[in-house]
């Protein structure tokens, strides 16, 4: 709605409010409307009055209130309703609801306020500035609006220029010099087509957004200048603008420069003042062209000779060209020369002073004014990087840390080219910009200034070129070369493009190949630099990641070890450590067990370690026999038992150490006892010969007594499975199948009782000696002892003897076992001879497998038995290393061993239970029947009911003889033993 329309409703609203306050109830037409009682402040304006409806409504100006749309209209109901109900309904529906009168009034008020603000700030309000200033469109983000702004500005410029004469232009320039802050100056600048706004961003946006418009404007200006024949006027006007620049620091100097440059460029391009070479030079030197173009080509050459003239003229347009370069992308020569001149001005006040003096020669007043103006605006440019700066500007005045340097483009490795002024600075990335700019300036100023000539001595082309038109051509060539060298920079690339387009590329083409080479070299160097800098960035990223993620400060080089550390402790490394000690499992096991136990009953300790639950009950004598000569055999036995039975393995955790230790000391004693028992039983000597080194004395005795069933099949198979592992495997299997074997062996051992009798005596002695050690090592060696005794116990079925031997857990006596075999040998052999042969074959296979697995795992864990026992054995039987890790799991697993041994015993008892029951019951309870043929040690220990071999062996034999009662007895006995072990 228009402001007038808004004003009308406001005035009318007041009247309506008064009317409403007086008349709470009013009629719209004939219908009565009941309105709630309200105060004037609360009531919204109601313009709906009978008067308004009487007169015809002008819908162009009619308002909602006039039509009767009021807050009450939304709540209207029948007249019968009360005001309270109306109020409630109104509360529910209208207040705050879209379309409610309150909301509408608010929206209307806000819209009015905004309209007022826009009217005040709108570009239309600023009519004087609207004509030629694109600043009016600063709020406009559309390119079309900016283009139109530029067009309008250029049109105004054309009109002013056509109307103004050169004298008027000069007068305008003087007035600008006197006071540039005045609106006239601003309008003139705006007319020139450049925004009055001094911010580099706005200038850049305006210039970049409408390059075509700007070009068209410059062309129009050039046309006007040519038509008016006031090229000199324009040239003068441009310096006038330049002189005005020092006065107006606030005014956008680059804009003025751009205007002057644009005029000069258009003049030079359109006017045939000079040949193409000089024209190109002038095109490159927009300031010079106005200066020289106004007079003649000779004037241009003089301008080039006296760099002060181009410096001054170009100093202002050089900055202009900077903006124009980014916008119009003028030929590279213009950029290079103007850049050089501007670089001279930027390089320092002394440089500017010299050019100012030279300019004084040409135009003292104008140039003097221009030089300070150039200094100030250039400083501005140095400060403000918003504009697109030419590479020359960067080379001249900007520090090395300019944005271009960040990309690495300004950096130019100084390569082979020493002829071109830029080549030598190219070697030094940061020095190049300064040298290049100075050289370019020197090219322009060389002849007049000796210091510049000295600086440009490195640039032979510039120094060699004599001052004059030739200098202009040489300067143009040098500028072309410079542009080619400046490629890394964006402006330099633009230059090159412009140079190629202009066609002034004679020297450029000649030097194009070396430039390409240099560019390639530079690129390679830049790549190298970037590659060298990349690792630093990566390092920064590393540190940043560390800080960000909050992870521990670990270098990437540590990632591999870190991964290993982060990984959960693999089970493989645990067995690996025991594997390292595979060579020394005996020593480790002996260390695990007490030295006394090892010395006395090393082998018995092994047997006890495995036989802790069951073997201790019955296989005390067998334990002495079970420990084998070879410590590896004891380890294998322990490992076999552990693999066969998890509880036994836990027991074997202790056992393997003790068993290996016992194997060292008692292995020899057992070997002797085995040899004795082997000597006594000729049929068993076969088994003993194999078993003495490999199997424990129990097997030897059993073999001697049961040479055929156990000796040949079982013990030999055990030999095949592993000599060292035979006894443990037999014991493990004996816990299950060796019970049957022992029962059968007891049958076979019955005839061999006489043979085992002698070893019984020797074994009994050993068991007596070893009993103490076995008692000490009951905790450590129960597993290994349980292995050997397990087999022996299978042979010896008397549960009573198993219990007695329990107390003498490790007092394994081959003699006692042999006595067991002798005493129980006949019944055991009679009962379990046949079954034992069958079981021995099965057990041999099982024993072989178990022996292989147990040997590996047990040898691995032998070194670190204590540390890894518990977890490992619980999870994997093969990975016994974990079980060996900690001795505590061995104790925990002892009850398991008891249970398993008892179960195995019960299993073994099931087959030979009747046989061994008769044997064990017939014979003394301590000495289990020599049922376990391979466990002749158990037989020997059976002679000595105290001895520990009867633990597993006796339990097995008890199971064999009396399957259920011995099992029950064995389980409690195993429990008691386990209690004793800890």
From Swiss-Prot:
One of its GO terms (biological process) is chromosome segregation. Transmembrane segments: none annotated. Residues 518-545 have a biased composition (Basic residues). Residues 669-685 have a biased composition (Basic and acidic residues). Residues 931-942 have a biased composition (Low complexity). Residues 75-97, 192-216, 274-315, 400-473, 489-545, 568-638, 651-716, 910-982 are annotated as: Disordered. Residues 75-87, 207-216, 275-315, 451-473, 498-512, 651-668, 952-964 have a biased composition (Polar residues). GO terms for molecular function: protein phosphatase regulator activity. Phosphorylated by CDK1. May regulate its subcellular location. Its main location: nucleus. Keywords: Cell cycle, Cell division, Isopeptide bond, Mitosis, Nucleus, Phosphoprotein, Ubl conjugation. Residues 379-436 form the PP1-binding domain. The modification Phosphothreonine is found at residues 309, 402. The keyword Translocase does not apply. The modification Phosphoserine is found at residues 100, 122, 133, 286, 296, 306, 390, 397, 424, 572, 595, 735, 913, 950, 973. GO terms for cellular component: chromosome; cytosol; nucleoplasm. It is found in: Nucleus. There is a cross-link at residue 741 (Glycyl lysine isopeptide (Lys-Gly) (interchain with G-Cter in SUMO2)). Interacts with PPP1CC. Regulator of chromosome structure during mitosis required for condensin-depleted chromosomes to retain their compact architecture through anaphase. Acts by mediating the recruitment of phopsphatase PP1-gamma subunit (PPP1CC) to chromatin at anaphase and into the following interphase. At anaphase onset, its association with chromatin targets a pool of PPP1CC to dephosphorylate substrates. This is Cell division cycle-associated protein 2. It comes from Mus musculus.
């Amino acid at each position: 709605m228009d402001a007038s329309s808004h004003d009308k409703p406001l005035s009318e609203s007041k009247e309506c409010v008064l009317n409403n306050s007086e008349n709470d109830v009013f009629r719209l037409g004939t219908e009565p409307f009941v309105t709630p009682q309200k105060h004037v402040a609360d009531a919204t304006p109601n313009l709906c009055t009978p008067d308004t409806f009487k007169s015809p409504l002008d819908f162009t100006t009619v308002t909602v209130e006039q039509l009767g749309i009021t807050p009450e209209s939304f709540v209207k109901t029948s007249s019968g309703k009360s005001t309270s109900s109306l109020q409630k309904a109104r509360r529910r529906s209208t207040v705050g609801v879209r379309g409610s009168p309150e909301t509408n009034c608010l929206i209307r008020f806000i819209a009015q306020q905004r309209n007022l603000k826009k009217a005040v700030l709108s570009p239309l309000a600023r009519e004087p500035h609207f004509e030629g200033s694109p600043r009016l469109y600063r709020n406009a983000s559309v390119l079309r609006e900016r283009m139109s702004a530029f067009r309008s500005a250029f049109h105004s410029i054309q009109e002013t220029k056509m109307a103004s004469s050169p004298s008027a232009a000069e007068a305008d320039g003087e007035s600008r010099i006197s006071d540039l802050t005045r609106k006239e100056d601003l309008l003139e600048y705006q007319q020139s087509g450049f925004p009055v706004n001094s911010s580099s961003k706005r200038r850049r946006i305006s210039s970049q957004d409408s390059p075509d418009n700007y070009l068209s404007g410059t062309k129009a200006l050039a046309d006007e200048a040519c038509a008016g024949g006031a090229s000199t006027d324009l040239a003068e006007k441009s310096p006038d603008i330049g002189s005005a620049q020092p006065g107006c620091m606030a005014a956008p100097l680059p804009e003025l420069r751009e205007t002057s440059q644009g005029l000069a460029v258009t003049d030079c391009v359109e006017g045939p003042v000079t040949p193409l070479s000089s024209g190109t030079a002038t095109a490159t030197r927009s300031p010079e062209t106005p200066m020289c173009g106004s007079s003649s080509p000779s004037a241009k050459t003089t301008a080039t000779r006296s760099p002060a003239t181009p410096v001054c003229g170009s100093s202002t347009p050089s900055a202009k060209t900077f903006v124009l370069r980014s916008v119009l992308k003028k030929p590279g020569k213009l950029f290079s020369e103007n850049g050089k001149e501007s670089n001279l001005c930027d390089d320092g006040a002394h440089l500017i002073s010299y050019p100012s003096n030279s300019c004084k020669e040409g135009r003292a007043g104008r140039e003097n004014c221009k030089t300070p103006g150039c200094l100030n605006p250039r400083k501005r440019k140095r400060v403000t990087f918003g504009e697109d700066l030419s590479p020359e500007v960067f080379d001249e005045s900007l520090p090395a840390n300019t944005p271009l340097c960040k990309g690495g483009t300004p950096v130019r490795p100084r390569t082979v080219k020493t002829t071109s002024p830029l080549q030598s600075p190219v070697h030094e990335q940061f020095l190049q910009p300064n040298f290049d700019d100075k050289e370019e300036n020197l090219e322009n100023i060389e002849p007049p200034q000796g210091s510049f000539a000295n600086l440009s001595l490195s640039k032979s082309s510039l120094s060699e070129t004599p001052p004059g038109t030739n200098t202009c051509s040489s300067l143009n060539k040098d500028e072309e070369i410079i542009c080619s060298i400046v490629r890394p920079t964006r402006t330099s690339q633009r230059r090159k493009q412009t140079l190629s387009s202009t066609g002034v590329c004679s020297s450029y083409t000649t030097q194009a190949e070396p430039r390409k080479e240099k560019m390639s070299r530079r690129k390679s160097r830049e790549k190298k630099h970037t590659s060298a800098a990349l690792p630093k960035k990566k390092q920064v990223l590393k540190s940043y990641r560390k800080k960000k993620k909050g992870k521990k400060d670990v270098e990437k080089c540590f990632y591999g070890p870190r991964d290993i550390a982060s990984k959960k402790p693999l089970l493989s490394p645990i067995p690996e450590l025991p594997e390292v000690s595979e060579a020394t499992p005996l020593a480790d096991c002996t260390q695990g067990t007490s030295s006394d136990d090892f010395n006395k009953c090393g082998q018995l300790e092994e047997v006890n370690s495995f036989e802790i639950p069951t073997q201790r009950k019955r296989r005390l004598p067998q334990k002495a026999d079970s420990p084998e000569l070879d410590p590896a055999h004891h380890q294998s036995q322990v490992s076999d038992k552990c693999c066969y039975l998890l509880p036994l393995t836990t027991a074997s955790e202790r056992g393997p150490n003790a068993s290996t230790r016992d194997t060292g000391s008692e292995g020899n004693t057992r070997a002797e006892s085995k040899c004795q028992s082997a000597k006594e039983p000729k049929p068993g000597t076969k088994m003993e010969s194999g078993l003495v080194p490999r199997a424990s004395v129990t097997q030897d005795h059993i073999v001697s007594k049961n040479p055929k069933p156990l000796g040949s099949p079982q013990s030999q198979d055990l030999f095949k499975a592993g000599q060292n592992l035979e006894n443990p495997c037999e014991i493990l299997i004996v816990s299950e199948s060796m019970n049957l074997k022992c029962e059968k062996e007891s049958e076979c051992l019955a005839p061999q009782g006489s043979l085992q009798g002698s070893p019984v005596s020797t074994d009994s002695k050993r068991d007596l000696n070893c009993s103490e050690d076995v008692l000490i090592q009951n905790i450590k060696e129960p597993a290994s002892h349980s292995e050997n005794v397990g087999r022996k116990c299978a042979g010896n079925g008397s549960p009573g003897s198993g219990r007695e031997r329990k107390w003498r857990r490790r007092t394994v006596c081959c003699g006692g076992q042999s006595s067991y075999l002798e005493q129980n040998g006949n019944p055991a052999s009679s009962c379990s001879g046949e079954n034992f042969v069958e079981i021995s074959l099965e057990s041999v296979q099982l024993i072989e497998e178990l022996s292989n697995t147990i040997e590996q795992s047990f040898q691995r864990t032998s070194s670190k038995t204590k540390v890894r026992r518990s977890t490992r054995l619980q999870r994997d039987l093969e990975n016994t290393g974990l079980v060996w890790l900690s001795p505590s799991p061995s104790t925990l697993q002892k009850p398991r061993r008891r249970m398993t041994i008892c179960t195995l015993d019960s299993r073994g008892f099931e087959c030979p239970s009747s046989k061994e029951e008769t044997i064990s019951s017939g014979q003394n309870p301590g000495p289990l029947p020599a049922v376990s043929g391979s466990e002749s040690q158990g037989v020997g220990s059976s002679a000595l009911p105290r001895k520990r071999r009867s633990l597993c062996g006796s339990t097995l034999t008890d199971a064999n003889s009396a399957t259920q009662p011995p099992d029950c007895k064995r389980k409690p006995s195993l429990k008691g033993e386990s209690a004793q072990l800890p």
